[in-house]
Amino acid sequence: MSLHSKLSESLKAYADLDKTVKEIEEQVSSMEEPVPKTVKYVTFEENLSEEEWESDSGDDDEDSIDDSLIPDYLRESSSITVDEDEEDQKEDMEEHLPTVSWEEEPTGIDIGFGPGIVMPSVSNHEGGTYVRYNGLGGVDPNCKDLISKMMRSLIGQIGNKYGYDIDLFDYQGDFLEVFLPHKPSKEDVRPDIRIGKKNEEGTSKQVSKPRGKEKIVLKTGDECGRFPMNKEAKKREPEGLWEVMKVLSVQFDPWKEDEPPLSLTIRDLFISESEFRLHCNHSQTEREMALVGIKLRRLYNKLYQKYRL
């Protein structure tokens, strides 16, 4: 195609476009109500006497205007819309915004999730604590299924191993709600409790032996001072808890068929002992809270490396 033919086609297209624009302008102008060009003036008749003028003016109101003199496009519509105040609109918008309520919990649960994944909400209830993970509705479906599957596997292991009736509620995949009971459903068989009993028996036998002065440091919580420790926690030795916990493994069902199950230890999931202490309390259900409160970002990284999600 020569340059001349290209130029001619461009000019033809431009002419068609100009014609289309003019047609649209004509249609718009025809839709608008035309403004009357004639102007009507109100004049006084000189031959009108004062009595006649007073009688005419008495019938009508002083501020009344002849409706025939008002153009149609200036007449008021029957319906009047009143905008609400901006403050009321802001209050209505704030009521519909998603909020996460945080309260001081005697059990000291800290989920440890950042706002980038899910936002947890903790609330007390008779006999236990509810932990609700909001924000799962916007997560990728594969990740959401993985999180739900991971939580179910983890909660089943905790309940079977330590005798806690932990329930998981999954409402259409939008959020997960975990119920942590305050008391186990059967006798506590945790090794640290047994160690504590042996230590108490040993100390009762060695009462007569003199001891030197020992400095007793009572911890009031974690590094941020969030979790106040109760009397039961002060009596026990929290140092032995990490030694037991870091070797515990959490085994998850394989994400794909013909794949071995994924087994991770608490040491793999937590960075250090200090981070572990930030995610569990030394009062009653340390293992359960630590396992439920592991950071999903670290677990997801492990799963991603293994299954290439």
From Swiss-Prot:
Annotated Gene3D superfamilies: Vesicular stomatitis virus phosphoprotein C-terminal domain (1.10.8.440)
Family per record: Belongs to the vesiculovirus protein P family.
Record-listed Phosphotyrosine modification sites: Y14
Upper classification of the organism: Viruses, Riboviria, Orthornavirae, Negarnaviricota, Haploviricotina
Organism the protein comes from: Spring viremia of carp virus (Rhabdovirus carpia)
InterPro entries the UniProt entry points to: Phosphoprotein_C_viral (IPR043036)
Compositional bias of kind Acidic residues: 47-66, 82-94
Superkingdom of the source species: Viruses
Region Disordered: start-end pairs: 38-98
Changes after translation: Phosphorylated by host kinases. Phosphorylation play an important role in facilitating trimerization and possibly P-L complex formation.
Cellular component terms per the entry's GO annotation: host cell cytoplasm; virion component
One GO term (biological process): viral transcription
Keyword Phosphoprotein found: yes
Modified residues (Phosphoserine): S272
Subunit structure: Homotrimer. This trimer is stabilized by binding to the L protein. Binds N(0), and N in ribonucleocapsid. May bind to host ref(2)P.
Free-text function comment from the UniProt entry: Essential component of the RNA polymerase transcription and replication complex. Binds the viral ribonucleocapsid and positions the L polymerase on the template. May act as a chaperone for newly synthesized free N protein, so-called N(0). Plays a role in virion assembly.
Entry protein name: Phosphoprotein
Alphabetic keyword roster: Chaperone, Host cytoplasm, Phosphoprotein, Viral RNA replication, Viral transcription, Virion
Subcellular location: Virion; Host cytoplasm
